[in-house]
């Protein structure tokens, strides 16, 4: 990467964390925030900032080019429903999507990346900015009933890995060795709320990356807000794939989980 970088910011604190890491490296950072998703305050932290919608790829590319930027990274959650709905309202994107084998999240995002590439903006691997945030392996917050959590995890772990590899979702919720909820377009937090409404307290939430995860595309992540959702749902545990799913605001999340009786576990 050169001395200038574009950041495409989706939902969650990942965008803010990555912007901070990039600026520590001395990069000029122009941020394009996804309207209705990117966290507030990025305008004050970026060297240049503009809002955009999922269909505004030409405007996004022009914004970056106007600041001398030819390379960008994409961070934060870009919900499938936004891409599937609003982005396909752009005729050029709709024509591109019509030629795709499916409209799964990774397929659509790769198509949008190719579209930006043709417009002169290369979307790069963001891994260099994520090193401080990897989820460690082991128990971060102990479970009240560790044997029960391990039983649920042993049941659900191969399922969530398969779910991720099938590009359906990256979150699975289980209880009593049964699948309660599978993440679809709604995202992790809404999946957890739905599971709690269906099965009550004590669910175990599992989150994993795809086996062949393209780090540019829909990288799974967890943070304080996700843990707060689990506490509200009175979940038993959150099990995250260690080393492959970034965990932001980890110390604050550990404190919230411990206070709320939710175990946090990193698993490979």
Feature annotation, model-predicted:
Residues 1-4, 25-28, 46, 67-70, ...:
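Short coil/turn connectors at secondary-structure junctions
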Residues 1-34:
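N-terminal basic/disordered segments at the start of proteins
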Residues 11, 77-80, 178, 210-211:
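Short glycine-rich anion-binding loops that position phosphate/pyrophosphate groups of nucleotides
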Residues 27-28, 32-34, 52-86, 110, ...:
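Conserved alpha/beta cores of soluble small-molecule-handling proteins
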Residues 22, 36, 123-227:
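Conserved mixed alpha/beta catalytic, RNA-binding, or beta-rich assembly cores of soluble enzyme
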Residues 88-143:
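Hydrophobic alpha-helical segments and helix pairs
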Residues 7-9, 31-32, 72-75, 105, ...:
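General beta-strand structural signal in soluble alpha/beta enzymes
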């Amino acid at each position: 990467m050169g001395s200038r970088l574009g950041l495409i910011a989706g939902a969650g604190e990942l965008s803010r964390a990555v912007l901070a890491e990039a600026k520590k490296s001395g990069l000029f950072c122009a941020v394009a925030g996804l309207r209705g998703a990117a966290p507030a305050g990025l305008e004050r932290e970026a060297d240049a900032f503009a809002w955009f919608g999922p269909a505004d790829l030409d405007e996004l590319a022009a914004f970056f080019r106007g600041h001398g930027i030819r390379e960008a990274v994409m961070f934060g959650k870009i919900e499938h429903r936004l891409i599937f709905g609003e982005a396909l309202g752009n005729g050029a994107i709709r024509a591109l999507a019509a030629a795709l084998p499916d409209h799964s999240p990774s397929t659509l995002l790769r198509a949008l990346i190719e579209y930006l590439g043709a417009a002169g903006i290369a979307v790069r691997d963001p891994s260099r900015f994520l090193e401080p945030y990897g989820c460690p392996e082991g128990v971060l917050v102990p479970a009240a009933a560790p044997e029960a959590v391990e039983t649920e995890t042993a049941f659900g772990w191969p399922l969530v890995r398969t779910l991720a590899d099938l590009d359906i979702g990256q979150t699975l919720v289980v209880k009593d060795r049964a699948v309660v909820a599978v993440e679809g377009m709604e995202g992790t937090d809404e999946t957890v709320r739905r599971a709690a409404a269906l099965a009550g307290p004590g669910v175990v939430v599992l989150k994993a990356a795809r086996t062949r995860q393209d780090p540019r595309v829909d990288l799974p992540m967890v943070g304080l807000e996700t843990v707060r959702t689990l506490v509200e749902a009175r979940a038993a545990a959150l099990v995250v794939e260690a080393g492959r799913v970034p965990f932001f605001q980890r110390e604050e999340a550990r404190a919230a989980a411990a206070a709320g009786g939710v175990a946090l576990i990193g698993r490979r």
